[in-house]
Amino acid sequence: MLQSFSDVTTEQIWKGQAVRRIPTDLQRQALKRLTYLNAAKRLEDLYQPPSNRFHALKGTGRYSISVNMQWRITFTWTEAGPAEVLFEDYH
């Protein structure tokens, strides 16, 4: 279960609220990935589907799953699940 968000935009997408500056189709893709993240019981669950391109970010203690080639969802992992969840333009 998602524990916390790093910004308001990510939380709005999770709640199904429209975010003007992000295209609707990209918001739908992000919500799909957030749903995968919310359902994960352990980090290993995020290796599927392979399109998540799940990996640890070097030296940060954060992890990443891909939404598309430009956008990612990054987060930390706690005993209770993902925290500090952030939908971000990674480039």
Cite the ranges covered by each PLM segment.
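Glycine-rich, flexible loop/turn motifs
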Residues: 1, 9, 18, 42, ...
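Arg/Lys-rich, positively charged N-terminal/basic patches that mediate binding to nucleic acids
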Residues: 1-34
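Compact soluble domain cores
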Residues: 24-51
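Enriched for short, Lys/Arg-rich terminal
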Residues: 54-58, 62-91
